[in-house]
Regions:
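Glycine-rich, acidic loop regions that bind phosphate or pyrophosphate groups
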Residues: 1-69, 205, 250
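Charged, low-complexity, helix-prone segments enriched in Lys/Glu/Asp/Gln
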Residues: 56-87, 153, 195, 200-207
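Thiamine diphosphate
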Residues: 25-27, 33-35, 39-45, 122-250
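Active-site diphosphate/adenylate-binding microenvironment
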Residues: 70-154
Length: 250
């Protein structure tokens, strides 16, 4: 299994199991590819491996688990929580503290739609991924996808609560989606992280071109009152500026 922390060993034998044919063999060639449910396959495979390898496999597995315990999701989750709490009183609100409050306020069985491009860096290490439909985010493509995508997700899952995270720059591309949410009476919670700029464009310009010529990338003359815009479109809204006010508002 590969991840951002531990790359796939070069000589590993790859057995890939899944129900999405398009995903099988996409990132790594599979020595054995099975179109099957992962959970059901593991139920059948684990007893067979135990019969074949016995205690020798248990010892190898224990060593690997011990190594991974320092870098796995649970470990990163604890560290990220600790770091976020250290910034719990920072002004302006620290993005990691915001994400921690968002995750802890989520009802069970919620779905998160994320287009908060530069403010959600801590989200992967805070949000547990419980099912294939529980998280939607864009890896690339056009800006402004998040707000209308949340509407589509809520319509597809009327029995689940949807939370949409969007940057202010992204929200400006499709802010009219709030009217659609109000018009359809959808119970979506929208959180717009407002840093008054296209921060993602600034980061790319600085990172790729070593330039800080940020032309047309700031929203400060005038500043945008997103809560006021939302209310004008029929959505109940508040502006949160104090770190301790995030959780009660959510």
């Amino acid at each position: 299994v590969g991840s951002k922390v531990v790359p796939m060993p070069p000589n590993a034998t790859v057995v890939q199991v899944g129900l999405n044919d398009w995903e099988i063999g996409k990132n790594y060639p599979a020595d054995i590819a099975l179109h099957a449910d992962v959970g059901e396959t593991m139920k059948a495979l684990i007893p067979a491996l135990q019969r074949q390898g016995g205690k020798s496999l248990d010892k190898i597995a224990a060593g690997r688990l011990s190594m991974l315990s320092k870098i796995n999701w649970g470990s990163r989750n604890l560290k990220t929580r600790e770091l976020a709490k250290e910034n719990s009183s920072v002004h302006p609100i620290d993005p990691d503290w915001l994400m921690l409050n968002v995750v802890d306020a989520l009802p069970s069985n919620s779905i998160v739609v994320n287009e908060s491009l530069t403010s959600s860096r801590a989200l992967p290490d805070l949000l547990p991924f419980r099912d294939r439909y529980g998280f939607h985010g864009n890896a690339s493509g056009g800006i402004g996808w998040g707000l209308p995508a949340a509407i589509g997700v809520q319509l597809a899952h009327p029995d689940r609560r949807v939370l949409c995270l969007s940057g202010d720059g992204s929200a400006m591309y499709s802010i009219q989606a709030l009217w659609t949410a109000a018009h359809l009476n959808l119970p979506i919670t929208f959180v717009i992280t407002n840093n008054r700029s296209y921060r993602i464009l600034k980061q790319r310009l600085l990172g790729f071109h070593k330039s800080d010529a940020y032309v047309g990338m700031d929203f400060d003359e005038p500043q945008i009152d997103f809560a006021g815009v939302a209310r004008s479109l029929g959505v109940t809204a508040d502006t949160i500026t104090e770190p301790e006010a995030i959780r009660p508002a959510l």
